[in-house]
Amino acid sequence: MKNAKIGFMPLYIKLYDDVGLAELRERLEPFYETMAKGFEEKGIEVVRSPFCRIESEFRDAVARFESVNVDCIVTWHAAYSPSLESAKILAETDLPIIVMDTTETYDFGPAQDSAEINLCHGIHGVMDMTNLLMRAGKPYAIAA
């Protein structure tokens, strides 16, 4: 049996780079790599993508995934990402979409530093993007 091959696409917002929030990337990029390695440890081949922020970056990532014949695209919202940048491109590909909804922060109990919210608001992008995928008739699965 053939092992799965995924295109692993992190979604991000360009605004954070534009205003100099490098500390977010410094934490999110290693977590992305941790997740990619976790897939690989389970025998899944992972084709990585740079963090995608704008339409052209999403288009380039999907084109690359298609060119190397991945079995599906796994998205991960590293932060809220405006869905108008990604949804049309994801809806147009023939590749199946799996939306991975997870964060590095396990819980938000009373002792949690409220700054963690800045690293865990991707769910808003998940809801936005999946709404547009559904409107476009693009099937997807959610893994949380």
What are these regions (language model features)?
Residues 1-144:
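Metallocofactor- and cofactor-centric catalytic cores in central/energy metabolism, strongly enriched
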